[in-house]
């Protein structure tokens, strides 16, 4: 590597560029250049103090503003003019001779200029010689370029040629690695270091290496511990003048650069200039590929990478690739786990300064970006731009496959993957494939078992940062996203977007198979799986298969038994946060969603929607086994289990199995005998809150559910449904052993025990055994001698509520069970069953069936 010169760390401006700078920017340029110069001298590196340093020290401009032909220094052949700009050696030599001959007229015949300065002393000699030369320049500047030939030569090969290259918009220097083009060779050389990862400038103190010399200079100041820039007000000292300036602004509160348009103030003029573009609305930088325009050229350059799809910068840690090196650098901080940027207000730390800046706005509550249409204000410009799209309703990015349109190109890119069945990103651990590398990366964390992101509030750990962020909202309870239509608020904008569809009646996504329409494409995609019959997501624990991964994940929680979401009101715990949210509505008693048809109110909009189907009379979900139709798919799914007979949820205490996990949960309470839910009216306690709620209706005396057949009213809809079966006479639940049919599955379950001699439930008090735990529980009351169930009519007390209910019928005299054969009525269904035997006896063919029906072996004569 050749000897380092001052020009290696020099910032250059063309004449026209210098004229564009304001006073503050020119002063900043002077400070930076002089600081670089002082640093080089301090390090003992030979520096030739050329005219630029002389001008800057004297406070003069580095450009002669009177004559546009003038350049930073007289046209001396210095190291600054590289071979790139002198293609012909003879022209270079002759040009030097012309200049020297011209200066000889002033008496400086022996003036000699060296190409490079090899020491500091030579640099001083060169400076003295140059000062003399500069004197000649001022006296003869009107004569030097009299000859047009020499003016043309100068303009062709001078430093100003670099500026001309920029205006031609030609980028002649191309990187062979990533095809990026540059105006100047020096920029290409700097860029190449990114690919080579070459750190040629090494610190002798610690051995740390840097790509650029300017970064090394800044780094070396750390080792000197010299902090010459001290602010008297707070006593704080700094290595760099720019840090001192920032500190000063904090204390004084002065921001010298103010926008005349909106009054916003900035620390420096360059930021102000960028800001001013917002008000002009101009977007001069246009993409030739898609026509999208940008306010800054850097934004256009970034955008172009989208069309090429090229991501040359790859992370060695996780393999993720990026369009830009800056994005890779930001990403790499994640792997270090460092968060050097701390908020002084709340102490929260961040990995990037930009994220800290965004966060700090929260404490100031400043929202300078206001939308004129609706008056809504935002803390940052990007949020304002996103909001603007809501009002315009524009969706310029359209999917060619299904016609779905999007507001942002990124959303379209994500959507396109849906149409391709390709999953190129495969997990080496379990073989699972993904469409995107980001999804694979998230999945891989599962195998490591690591959960590095911990909640400070409840110590719950997460495998990714986004999951932690979502979780933290639970503790704050904040719901910033509000629906303008119904006022409902949400924690996340995505939930609000999904909710808004409810208010629209449009269902653009239609199933070609069955014609069913959906509001979201995602819902249609899930629906289509039903037609294929595929269930690719299988539970490793129990072998149960599912249509989608989300259902499988929910199912897996059953096996863990974890219930992390707890109600603060009653202590009840839930497996999912959504279930807790639903539960909370019970305590508030609020029912904002009302049915216009019948006036019934609901806690959730989904419950209202399900209810409204009842009024339409539609039952689109049909059972393929028995043809029975249902208004909801969930009810159909529950019904289908009847035919399969599957009971995957088993009680570890008594071995009883259930079709649904909710039933198992309810059952488990029996073994604990805990009854935390107490009625304030009568003191009766219950295992479940739902049982207490049902009980409370008794005290109100209300019976809103009426039977259309006989006019009998009930306090609960479930009781009405059970009652209606009496009139239909339907008995869908049949015993495979003896053929006996039942109206309810629970009755069939109880009946099945008859065929088995097994009695697993034994009384510890007297040794009596029972087939059902419920029978044992009833029996145990006998030993206590308690009779908590009392008849209000006659005062008679009973061990259990069912016996009390049977007794109460005596006082009412009601006989709801009627024989279709002879019209005779009975108070209990069991009596009606016995009575029916009389009619069946007349037909000898039915005798065997009657015996089976009643599960008896004795002659029927004995029963009359």
Swiss-Prot record:
UniProt record, GO biological process: regulation of transcription by RNA polymerase II
A cellular component annotation (GO) from this entry: nucleus
Zinc finger (C2H2-type): 173-195, 201-223, 229-251, 257-279, 285-307, 313-335, 341-363, 369-391, 397-419, 425-447, 453-475, 481-503, 509-531, 537-559, 565-587, 593-615, 621-643, 649-671, 677-699, 705-727, 733-755, 761-783, 789-811, 817-839
InterPro entries, per the entry: KRAB (IPR001909), KRAB_dom_sf (IPR036051), Znf_C2H2_sf (IPR036236), Znf_C2H2_type (IPR013087)
GO molecular function: DNA binding; zinc ion binding
Alphabetic keyword roster: DNA-binding, Metal-binding, Nucleus, Repeat, Transcription, Transcription regulation, Zinc, Zinc-finger
Family: Belongs to the krueppel C2H2-type zinc-finger protein family.
Name of protein: Zinc finger protein 99
Gene: ZNF99
